[in-house]
Amino acid sequence: MLDREGYRPNVGIILVNARNEVFWGKRIREHSWQFPQGGIKHGESPEQAMYRELYEEVGLRPEHVKILGRTRGWLRYDVPKHWIRREWRNTYRGQKQIWYLLRLVGRDTDVCLRASTHPEFDAWRWSEYWVPLEAVIEFKRQVYQQALTELSRLLFRSKPAELPEGYRQGTASQA
């Protein structure tokens, strides 16, 4: 399901623990790390998609998390042409995402990367909130920067978080 501009509706999930560290999943059989994310199915709300993806990719159920907030609007990224299947190249541009910030209220042992028959991750870890942007695949960096920056105000209310290098407005690399 694509919108008129060629973007696939999608949700992204920033899951934090009590120390405000983020869940970082290692893509199966790859050396890249990312946040959980996935497409919104026809007839599904972004929140329903978020809970489905959270279970499929991380094995967590709604009772394991608390929603702290979400991005105000869609954040978009274009996928490089050489990553797009040939039959989709004339219509598909990339993803548009609503990002959710979730607090784990369950335990680390509730995480199960094999909850679905098609696992996305083969390892995971907790990382500092401001993940190094160079660790993010280049074409997703700006969206990660935008989502982490926008949602940080929900975690760091008492003192404005000093944005690390690379998170200051307009400094993320773009594809």
Curated annotation (Swiss-Prot):
Its cofactor is a divalent metal cation. Keywords: Hydrolase. InterPro entries: Nudix_hydrolase, NUDIX_hydrolase-like_dom_sf, NUDIX_hydrolase_CS, NUDIX_hydrolase_dom, RppH. A motif (Nudix box) lies at residues 38-59. One of its GO terms (cellular component) is cytoplasm. Coiled coil: none annotated. Pfam families: NUDIX (PF00293). GO terms for biological process: mRNA catabolic process. Its EC number is 3.6.1.-. Residues 6-149 form the Nudix hydrolase domain. The keyword Oxidoreductase does not apply. GO terms for molecular function: mRNA 5'-diphosphatase activity. NCBIfam families: PRK00714.1-2, PRK00714.1-4, PRK00714.1-5. PANTHER family: M7GPPPN-MRNA HYDROLASE (PTHR23114:SF17). HAMAP family: Nudix_RppH (MF_00298). Belongs to the Nudix hydrolase family. RppH subfamily. Accelerates the degradation of transcripts by removing pyrophosphate from the 5'-end of triphosphorylated RNA, leading to a more labile monophosphorylated state that can stimulate subsequent ribonuclease cleavage. This is RNA pyrophosphohydrolase.
